[in-house]
Amino acid sequence: AAAGVDGVEIVGSHGYLPSQFLSPSINFRTDQYGGNPENRRRFVAEVIQSIRASCPEELIVGARLSGDEFDSGGLDEDAMFEICRNLAPSLDYLNVIAGTSASSGGSVHIVPPMTVSNGYMAPFSAKLKQAVGPTAVLVAGRINQPQDAEKIVREGAADMCGMTRAMICDPRMPAKASLGQVDDIRACIGCNQACIGHAQLGLPISCIQYPESGRELRFAEKPRAEVSRRVLVVGGGPAGMKAAITAAETGNSVTLWERSSRLGGQALLAQALPNREEFGGIINNLEGELRRAGVSVSLNSEFDQPNCSEFSPDAVVLATGSRRWMPPIEGGEGVEILHHEDILAGAKTGQRVVIYDWRTDWIAIGMAELLSQSGADVRLAVNGVCPGFAIQNYVRDAAIARLYRLGVETTAFMRLYGAEDRTVYFVHTAAQEPVVLEDVDTLVVVPPNQPEVGPADWLKSSGIPYRIIGDALAPRTAEEAVYEGLTATLELLT
């Protein structure tokens, strides 16, 4: 109370100290704090009592507990229900979440990725709410839209909903919901990249869709253009869309040209893979922002010198993206070799497939899932420590679990050397020794892309101010693309 807070929450979830006392697989004490369920609850009960004894009566006291640790050696839903039911009378509220840091599988639920169903802990909170009387129940975990939260509360599954990532993605979400502007809400897609992913790297929390989040002081007031300029943005991927939105929001007349028939760029590839469909939400969200900002979008529009001269822009943002690249591969006879984009375009593989994962991101994982689900025998050779090494660990570990269940054989520390006669040759990058995979019908290579920056050659001599952003600058992720769409455009126009 002296600190000016209205309440205290005891974090007893996720394998932290309070939950360690609660768990029979961790708590082997033989004194009054171990043994039977009542003794294992004693530590948490005494923490609650000590807070009550030393604080004013009106101070709110709650506890966050995992409703299910989703760990084979952890506390399941039945055990947690009894724990919550017994602790509830001494608490003002219970905050129900899931998971544990005690295992990779359990930790996935600490910040559940897009593969976890929306509001998946609501059935547990509904059951608990019926049993705890006046104690309020808060539920969290993949609740990313206000309509979902309202439904949970309306149906009596909880009194409150926690929506942390939803608020990072769109800090104005509650205000928009209260005004009935639900379609304007930028929905979280559960990618975990710039929120918990940043936190785990010791970086400021942000959002790949909304880089202003966490940088409010820097971008609190976007400078308005003194004179509206005619801005041309070339490329309709995440970088180009964010650039166009930023240019329009600062008072300029903005047109976006996209060479293909759809906006989205590399995000279209992401949403086409198994368990990544929700990533397409970034496209929907940015398209909505384009409309609201008044950006003129022209699809099937090629950017070349004559077209640019005819349009006569005052400034150009090149977000032309990247193009596929295939590394030279020794041999090549007797093994079908495909690029991962060939698979998405409909190419068929043989029965026995080796996927070479150069990137260690989500693409090779998606390829392995896609081909395995179609009936192929898949081996995944990874140019890194493990599949998904470059992506956030909860997303990665959930994917590794899926690959294991599908029977995908994974080999790490692989560098592709060559392929011939139904055999693929690798070098183990740590041991510097050969690794040979035999009986291979098809080798699918997942390499990095190369920047698509052709127009920059003549634009340099045109005298038109311009910036190159996103994959056109260097192929990376949607986070860097959207961030540069914001920062480089502001730099160009102010």
Where are these regions (language model features)?
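Glycine/Thr-rich phosphate-binding loops of Rossmann-like dinucleotide-binding domains
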Residues: 18, 71, 104, 171, ...
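C-terminal, flexible cofactor-proximal segment of oxidoreductases
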Residues: 446-494
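Redox-cofactor binding/interface segments in oxidoreductases and associated redox assembly factors
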Residues: 10, 95-96, 163, 317-319, ...
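Beta1-alpha1 glycine-rich phosphate/pyrophosphate-binding loop at the start
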Residues: 233-300, 355-398, 409, 465-470
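Flavin-dependent oxidoreductase catalytic cores
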Residues: 1-234, 238, 246-249, 253-254, ...
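Internal hydrophobic alpha-helix adjacent to the cofactor/substrate pocket in enzyme cavities
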Residues: 170, 175-176, 243, 373-382, ...
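A Rossmann-like FAD-binding core segment of flavoenzymes
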Residues: 280-325, 332-334, 339-343, 348-349, ...
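Glycine-rich dinucleotide-binding loop and its adjacent helix/turn
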Residues: 211-224, 288-291, 299, 320, ...
